[in-house]
Amino acid sequence: MSDAVPQVGSQFGPYQLLRLLGRGGMGEVYEAEDTRKHRVVALKLISPQYSDNAVFRARMQREADTAGRLTEPHIVPIHDYGEINGQFFVEMRMIDGTSLRALLKQYGPLTPARAVAIVRQIAAALDAAHANGVTHRDVKPENILVTASDFAYLVDFGIARAASDPGLTQTGTAVGTYNYMAPERFTGDEVTYRADIYALACVLGECLTGAPPYRADSVERLIAAHLMDPAPQPSQLRPGRVPPALDQVIAKGMAKNPAERFMSAGDLAIAAHDALTTSEQHQATTILRRGDNATLLATPADTGLSQSESGIAGAGTGPPTPGAARWSPGDSATVAGPLAADSRGGNWPSQTGHSPAVPNALQASLGHAVPPAGNKRKVWAVVGAAAIVLVAIVAAAGYLVLRPSWSPTQASGQTVLPFTGIDFRLSPSGVAVDSAGNVYVTSEGMYGRVVKLATGSTGTTVLPFNGLYQPQGLAVDGAGTVYVTDFNNRVVTLAAGSNNQTVLPFDGLNYPEGLAVDTQGAVYVADRGNNRVVKLAAGSKTQTVLPFTGLNDPDGVAVDNSGNVYVTDTDNNRVVKLEAESNNQVVLPFTDITAPWGIAVDEAGTVYVTEHNTNQVVKLLAGSTTSTVLPFTGLNTPLAVAVDSDRTVYVADRGNDRVVKLTS
């Protein structure tokens, strides 16, 4: 690959290179069409001088493999990576947003509520990375992407390395931006994940003040400030606008001694939230809810659309001028053209046009009405969880995505259950129902919970689980014991009436999602990050890997009364069945299914599946070759599904913050 002559129009393996988006010291970024899947992607091609370096290839392969398994919502996943004709590549999605650096440069400091809301999301991304042995090493505003609805992503994990294998990174290399580098980065002391916490505290301070933590006229003086000077006090720099309690949060996050910092990025985020005034806490929560719902609506794009003039809702002193470019020569991100939200016949039409210029977060702080989540302008940006920093500036274009509307009027047989307390950050995720008709839901968030709605009740109960981190799958057995997976890579159980939870002895889980329990008490887990399904028999301390083959991001698992196991093989767009006590795997004849997610099976062997992208629930009768769509209405990103003995179907309607049931 030449650094001077782009390869636009040429073929790179299965990729047709459509447009050069950016060029950096290590390679180029292209808008490309994956001709196998007929979708537009972001493709990073690493230059020959690095692709030919065995040490570099080993490092990038290790980092891409590790970071590519990070499924935390605030980390952008990669589709694929590898080598073609000796050249290393990384394929990623295109998402919408602008860098935090651009927002701060154009509009100045954020409100405390918005600053904390963004930092809480980045903290969740860091905690997920740290739990997998990955340190980012370059947390800064340039590497934080914020959408028009304030959903935040941490990008550019290309300089990150697996903490357990330092041999792949040269010792002593100063990687990152000096403004956000922890003191130990300059002294040769051991650098741990807490360097990321220091950087996040620096970012929080800059969000509150509009300036990096230390001002210096030389690199040497800047390093000395990190080593010797006290942390800045935002409340002194912006008196009356920043709560003084945030000064202590910044000070602890930027402690010179790593051991004196917060134990986790999440702890820093919680402390920052607690330091806000009550009014600001409500504003921050509103921002988080809106960002989650809007992002769940915006499905990763597959095809291109015509461009139109666009602006983005920013932060600070005023709205941007419609049509103005938002990327400046400091932004380490690449803006690409807009893509369709769903090209497979989903009910998310797209069209060109403008939306209100007033920032959503600013509206929240002023108490004005917030426009519908669908009325958002889009700036399509290329980011990657395992990509190197490639700086590029291009003009942005956008379009409107109309949110599927739904009416409080229920379809025949459809009912919204009276759950409360699940409308915060990616909720609900899992759903289960016991033999008595009690319904359980995981309220997914940075620190989540399990909520129970008793039969006939209009009030909910929070079960006494503790320490759950983004709980996912949920199941309940005949005795009323509740099982839940979370992103601590574990399965936790709570017996009926007990306050003492138990962690089951599963080993090596990597982002477990779906969960099921059979009539014998055996527990099944869709171990998404490892592309497998594991089983733990009742009373056993040793798990078994079930002999499924070719799984790609399995999300849901179910088991019937005969012991047959069913899995939604999400990225392969199929549902597979493993017959009891055999190696016989069968692909079920669901019709044109896309992104299957949740799965359940009733006593008659009918299989129910949610389609994540098309907002449908489909069922396949035992022995049938034709699936049918259930008459749910207004679903928005349905995830888990459950069915009771009366064949009433329950769905976690995540994008609408509700649980819906449909009677047979």
Swiss-Prot record:
Its main location: membrane. It is found in: Cell membrane. Residues 403-664 are extracellular. One of its GO terms (biological process) is cellular response to phosphate starvation. The modification Phosphothreonine is found at T135, T169, T171, T173, T209. One of its GO terms (molecular function) is manganese ion binding. NHL repeats lie at residues 414-456, 457-497, 498-539, 540-581, 582-623, 624-664. One of its GO terms (cellular component) is plasma membrane. Dimerization activates the kinase domain of unphosphorylated PknD via an allosteric mechanism, triggering autophosphorylation and phosphorylation of target proteins. Phosphorylated PknD is fully active even in the absence of dimerization. The modification N-acetylserine is found at S2. Autophosphorylated. Dephosphorylated by PstP. Keywords: Acetylation, ATP-binding, Cell membrane, Kinase, Membrane, Nucleotide-binding, Phosphoprotein, Repeat, Serine/threonine-protein kinase, Transferase, Transmembrane, Transmembrane helix, Virulence. InterPro entries: 6-blade_b-propeller_TolB-like, Kinase-like_dom_sf, NHL_PKND, NHL_repeat, Prot_kinase_dom, Protein_kinase_ATP_BS, Ser/Thr_kinase_AS. Its EC number is 2.7.11.1. Pfam families: NHL, Pkinase. Residues 15-276 form the Protein kinase domain. Induction: Increased expression after 3 hours of phosphate starvation, no protein detected after 24 hours phosphate starvation (at protein level). Part of the pstS2-pknD operon. Belongs to the protein kinase superfamily. Ser/Thr protein kinase family. PANTHER family: MITOGEN-ACTIVATED PROTEIN KINASE KINASE KINASE 20-RELATED, SERINE_THREONINE-PROTEIN KINASE NEKL-3. Part of a signaling pathway that enables adaptation to osmotic stress through cell wall remodeling and virulence factor production. Phosphorylates the osmosensory protein OprA, which inhibits binding of OprA to Rv2638, leading to the regulation of osmotically regulated genes, including the ESX-1-associated virulence factor espA. In addition, directly phosphorylates the alternative sigma factor SigF and its regulator, Rv1364c, which regulates the SigF-Rv1364c interaction. Can also phosphorylate the FHA domain of Rv1747. This is Serine/threonine-protein kinase PknD. The gene is pknD.
